[in-house]
Amino acid sequence: MKIDQNNARILGVMSGSSLDGIDLALCHFRREGEGWAFQVEAATTVPYDAAMRERLLRATEANGLELARLHRDIGIAIGTACRDLLQGQSADLIASHGHTIFHQPDEGLTLQVG
């Protein structure tokens, strides 16, 4: 699949340290002259339930199996949130970095799940 480099619908997804949920924004970008214009077509936050929030809070203490399960479950939650926001429409690109478990740039370490 090739993306039109002058016109694209892009879905951005993130989950931050606030642990409030999965943030999504579907934007239509189009080139206008030398720059870009965009329109936000839809945006929402899908809240985490209490159990997922607790798992994310404790993730730095998790063992390998627990992290693997969290990675899978957050990935499913992100995919479901994307599907629900798009409601059968298409996006040219979905940009997601998952949820950051820890980030220690001074040591060159970061870990995202999902």
Each model region followed by its residue ranges:
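Short acidic/glycine-rich loops and adjacent helix/strand connectors
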Residues: M1-G114
